């Protein structure tokens, strides 16, 4: 639904204790211009509900809750800086 593939953070990753690293972005998805390979996703928010992304399993479980057209916010790290991007689910 988001057009991205993720993996668990490497054990030696110091910038965040939990989250996932983006390994691939589908160029045709709504995420394509907002999420980059190498980004770390730590949280996803839908409405007033915020979900912590602990690993790739929790990421997939969270994403499965959304339907096409839902508006969400992705919280993460890029190059050591925090970011928040709004995305409409594909």
Go through the PLM ranges and name each one:
Residues 1-90:
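C-terminal recognition in membrane/secretory proteostasis and scaffolding
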């Amino acid at each position: 639904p988001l057009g991205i593939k993720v993996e668990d953070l490497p054990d030696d990753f110091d910038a965040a204790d939990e989250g996932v690293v983006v390994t691939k972005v589908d160029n045709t998805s709504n995420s394509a211009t907002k999420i980059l390979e190498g980004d770390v996703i730590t949280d996803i928010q839908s409405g007033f509900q915020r979900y912590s992304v602990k690993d790739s399993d929790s990421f997939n479980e969270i994403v499965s809750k959304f339907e096409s057209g839902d508006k969400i916010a992705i919280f993460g790290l890029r190059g050591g800086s925090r970011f928040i991007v709004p995305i409409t689910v594909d």
